[in-house]
C-alpha cells in the first residue's frame, strides 16, 4: 500500500533504499 507502516517496513528491509 501506501501507508506509513509500509514505508517503515521498506526502510527496515533496505536502509539503502531509504
Swiss-Prot record:
This protein's record includes keyword S-adenosyl-L-methionine: no
Lipid biosynthesis keyword on record: no
GO biological-process terms attached to the record: defense response to fungus; killing of cells of another organism
Superkingdom of this protein's organism: Eukaryota
Thermal dependence, as annotated: Thermostable.
Keyword set, alphabetical order: Antimicrobial, Fungicide
Tissue expression from the record: Leaves.
Misc note: Resistant to heat and proteolysis.
Its biological purpose: Has antifungal activity against the plant fungal pathogens G.graminis, P.infestans, P.megasperma and S.sclerotiorum. Does not have antifungal activity against the human pathogen C.albicans. Does not have ribonuclease activity.
Protein name in UniProt: 30 kDa antifungal protein
Organism: Engelmannia peristenia (Engelmann's daisy)
